[in-house]
């Protein structure tokens, strides 16, 4: 929730919402002062079908903006970087005063971001980095998420063969998460207590691609895998499906993040080790 509150504060500041009454409100947020009155906030989601965005983040953003008196408009790129370019231009055409963008590809989105900035429209990159210094950036501590994932898996499997299922190569978070995981596991890797027997990026964080990659790693290693550090719950689902096909589900530690309902069910069943909620 602190990320949503910080996001609202940035929106209010970007639109000059703190120009009046700042000395009287103390610690109150824009929601309490009506700082968003008359502001239209356009949100470009990379993929609204992701449970985390649809069930938690969007409702929180909508509620905060509504309380501040701001209008919310949105678009869903369906995991298409090309579609997101069009979406952002459409949000501008609809009168967005501020843009919040969860980018599918932090570099591919640059033409639309630069167009917005040239028109004086503030741009906030949400969760994922946009490679433009003019775009504000608010995110979670993804390195710490990676650490927590690795700690949970390593606590269960301190020795053995590890596979790393990373996120989309075009998303900086994939490397932030992997960096945190590496911090925790470096000593064990150096000592040979654990061995990295497979590592891959996953286009669009797609569970089906994660499953295919995991199937390949199982084949390459004759199913001799004891742990999988998967960077989110969707991909963890693909990993578990690959493990189930080989009769290994429940015997291999698997990480994730986002607190998806399906992932929590897998944790309860013992086929997934951890889901980090950020």
Predicted ranges, named:
Residues 10-14:
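C-terminal motif of bacterial Sec signal peptides marking the signal peptidase cleavage site
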Residues 15-278:
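A residue-level marker of the well-folded mature domains of exported/periplasmic proteins
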Residues 1-3:
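Bacterial N-terminal signal peptides that target proteins for export
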């Amino acid at each position: 929730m602190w990320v949503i509150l910080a996001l609202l504060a940035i929106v209010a500041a970007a639109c000059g919402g703190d120009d009046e009454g700042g000395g009287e409100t103390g610690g109150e947020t824009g929601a309490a002062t009506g700082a968003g009155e008359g502001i239209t906030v356009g949100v470009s989601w990379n993929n609204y079908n992701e449970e985390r965005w649809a069930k938690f983040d969007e409702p929180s953003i909508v509620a905060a903006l509504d309380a501040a008196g701001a209008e919310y408009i949105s678009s869903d790129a369906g995991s298409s970087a090309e579609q997101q370019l069009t979406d952002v231009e459409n949000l501008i055409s609809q009168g967005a005063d501020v843009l919040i963008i969860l980018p599918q590809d932090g570099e591919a989105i640059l033409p639309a971001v630069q167009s917005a900035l040239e028109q004086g429209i503030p741009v906030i990159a949400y969760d994922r980095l946009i490679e433009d210094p003019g775009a504000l950036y608010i995110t979670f501590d993804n390195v710490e998420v990676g650490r927590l994932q690795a700690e949970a898996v390593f606590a269960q499997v301190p020795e053995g063969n590890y596979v790393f299922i990373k996120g989309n190569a075009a998303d900086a978070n994939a490397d932030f998460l992997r960096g945190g995981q590496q911090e925790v596991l470096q000593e064990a890797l150096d000592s040979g207590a654990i061995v990295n027997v497979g590592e891959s990026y996953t286009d669009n964080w797609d569970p089906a691609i994660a499953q295919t990659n995991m199937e390949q790693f199982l084949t390459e290693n004759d199913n001799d895998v004891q742990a999988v550090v998967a960077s989110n719950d969707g991909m963890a689902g693909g990993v578990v499906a690959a493990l189930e096909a080989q009769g290994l589900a429940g015997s291999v530690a698997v990480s994730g993040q986002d607190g998806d309902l399906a992932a929590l069910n897998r944790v309860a069943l013992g086929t997934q080790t951890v889901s980090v909620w950020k």
